[in-house]
Amino acid sequence: MYAEVVWSTFDRLPLVAPEARASVETGLIALCRRLDVEPVAVKVSATRARLVLRFKPAHSIGAVVTALKLGSQDAAVVAGRPIRWAPGFACLSLSVTEVRRRALRLRARH
């Protein structure tokens, strides 16, 4: 299953500093691979994280996203800027054709 997953910072404040974004993205990609989830596209902005992911049938999306949020907070602390994510997340299932379109658009942003 392909899905776009999005979560925001606490109160949508710009808590992800520009110099920490690449580190957080790299950390999210590595964590996805450890969780056996395919990261198709990953983008972190000042106020949110947006990922296009390929899940396996046995995955619990909620458990994966919880692990990703916690792991990305750790990556940001290592980069020197703590992040506080807001509770919850949005998830939208994607068709195979929509995956390509969203991944390209996500990579072109910011």
Walk through the language-model features, giving the residues of each.
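Charge-rich, low-complexity N-terminal segments
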Residues: 1-110
